[in-house]
């Protein structure tokens, strides 16, 4: 049986005064692409990243260092408000570094920050559509009949009503927590497969896109923990005639967003077509199970683009084509991407001409 939170028992303790002390929850990406966190007591409130101390953790327990040299360092990168503790308490997204000062192998933010700094005059904006699937503690899709299947896809996308959507309370809690924390969440919707949902984050400029998506993920898995529900970011969590889960990446630069920008959108698509294999390599593990040419995807081995075509690698929204400027949507990234790697390679390809 899964452990259930006792929010009623916890509530009176969270209401106690902290005095002048503040709790800072340091959050980082582990060696397997998951999320970890631990808490530090601070002596005063801060909103300045420079006032936060560098911390460390046991990297041998997170697949980030050997046991004989296990210290990995946490360097604060972004601050968010803490929706779990409230008050002046904060969440600190941190980068991981080895003891020699080099970025840990899972620290993709470090490289992408350099890329975004080089491309800052282009003002790259991103909006990511994070799909995910909910599972019961026993590993069955949340809300599905035990030992069976729900009806075929059709009524679930943006659905309303019993039997069409599952765990809306969890999703609403996550939405509000993101807004409170300062995550630039822009929307939510139920997805095509039952118990699959999506939230959107953005527009965010440059490196902040990865920061905000990772923190939104952290909030989601923490809240799901309270519900006793598991969150899967696998791109094809269930075999068969069910949609996979992606992280569609909407992208533009300053010139694309201005009148006449369609020319630059077309140029970006041409550049992306020439590095399809390099992009697929960082667009998520097991993405071949999702990019089959079915279920609103293009085939992983082919590059394609089109207006309003959800079966293409790159989709240009119809309103963008009609007005002649705006953005493109890269539909290839899987739900389990590292957003730093994806946003970084898109800018490298389209702005820095790698």
Curated annotation (Swiss-Prot):
Q: Which InterPro entries did the record assign?
A: Gln_synt_N, Gln_synt_N_sf, Gln_synth/guanido_kin_cat_dom, Gln_synth_cat_dom, Gln_synth_gly_rich_site, Gln_synth_N_conserv_site, Glutamine_Synthetase
Q: Which PROSITE patterns match?
A: GLNA_1 (PS00180), GLNA_ATP (PS00181), GS_BETA_GRASP (PS51986), GS_CATALYTIC (PS51987)
Q: Which reaction does it catalyse?
A: L-glutamate + NH4(+) + ATP = L-glutamine + ADP + phosphate + H(+)
How does this protein assemble?
Homooctamer.
User: Which GO cellular component term is one of those annotated?
Assistant: cytoplasm
What family does the database annotate?
Belongs to the glutamine synthetase family.
What GO molecular function annotations does the UniProt record carry, in alphabetical order? ATP binding; glutamine synthetase activity
Its source organism is Suillus bovinus (Jersey cow bolete)
Q: What class of enzyme is it?
A: ligase
Q: Where is the GS beta-grasp domain?
A: 22-101
Gene from which the chain derives:
GLNA
Domain GS catalytic: start-end pairs: 108-354
Name of the protein in its database record: Glutamine synthetase
Biological processes, Gene Ontology terms: glutamine biosynthetic process
Recite the UniProt keywords alphabetically.
ATP-binding, Cytoplasm, Ligase, Nucleotide-binding
Chief subcellular location: cytoplasm
User: Which PANTHER family does the record associate with it?
Assistant: GLUTAMINE SYNTHETASE (PTHR20852), GLUTAMINE SYNTHETASE 2 CYTOPLASMIC (PTHR20852:SF57)
Subcellular localization, as worded in the UniProt entry: Cytoplasm
